Amino acid sequence: MTKRDALWVVTTYFNPAGYRSRRENYRRFRTALGDLPCLTVECALADQPFELPPSPDVLPLRAHDALWHKERLINLAISKLPRSCHFVAWIDADVLFQRLDWPARAQTLLDRHLAVQLFSDVVQLPSPQRPDDLPIRTRGFVATITEKPDALSVGRFDAHGHTGYAWATHRSVLEAAGLYDACIVGSADHVMAHAFVGHPTATCVTRLLGDHSPHLRHFERWSARLQSVAESLGVSGLGFVSGELSHLFHGAISDRRYFERNQRLRQLGFDPTRDLIEVPDEPHRLRDDAGPIACFLRDYFAQRNEDAVTDEKSSV
């Protein structure tokens, strides 16, 4: 077994609105990975056709409801990986790495860390239709808090750096605790990053999930399980791979309404234990697929407008 065989990439492809940008970004992402082992989980909504051609490296799953499925899909993929896989990198299918040796570097860092963010800086590229627009540069979460630990206590996304895009951890962590998969409008990467450093009730988290809400309590239980697994493995804290990541354009960030979407979910009283049905080997389902939460989710995903040609910086 080589070190290269020990790490697999898992990514997801979910395109119920049929965005052209998402298809093209996935093609560029997958091509850039080269021969690095990668399993793509494609999720089709209801009776929509799958877009990716059949392949041993594509796991097709069908969802009943329109919601944020990414973390659930990644969790379902883990059992499909070969036993030679000891580390898993979960990566958004719209990024490109500047540093090609990131897999080896990540494995070295995972000898002592719970998880590794696979970049130190991200460049959000402009729309291909507006190539003269300036890219937006952002420091990564782990690089930021390593250099400025006080950034964690500020309670603002822009203060502590970007929490998303590309991470890696031990397969055994994902088998025992999984990723947190009940953020049904997204932002799981943000709240998980705080849990990785032992702050599951940080201001950033309570702003998104609510203070003393059922959603927050559900997240705290997952966080406690994660820390227990980390202790049993003798790993802790976070590392990062120094290097730049390019994020391919797919619509205006403002159309994703990062804070507003979670605020609305709180107003609707979302409780994962009550409102989600966990079916083995399937994406999550809503218990009430015609209720106010389902209606909100359908409207939200329809308004993301990922084929738009302008972008703006987000603060959450």
What are these regions (language model features)?
Residues 5-11, 30, 36-41, 77:
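Hydrophobic targeting segments
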Residues 43, 90-94, 119:
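Active-site acidic Asp-centered loop
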Residues 84-98:
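Short beta-strand-to-loop acidic/aromatic patch adjacent to the donor-nucleotide binding site
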Residues 41, 116-121, 241, 248:
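Short glycine/serine/threonine-enriched helix-capping/active-site loop
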Residues 98-199, 211-221:
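Conserved catalytic core of nucleotide-sugar-dependent glycosyltransferases
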Residues 2-5, 15-23, 29, 183-316:
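C-terminal catalytic/acceptor-binding lobe
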Residues 13, 18, 25-26, 32-34, ...:
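A conserved acidic beta->alpha catalytic loop
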Residues 42-85:
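Active-site-proximal specificity loops/subdomain of glycosyltransferases
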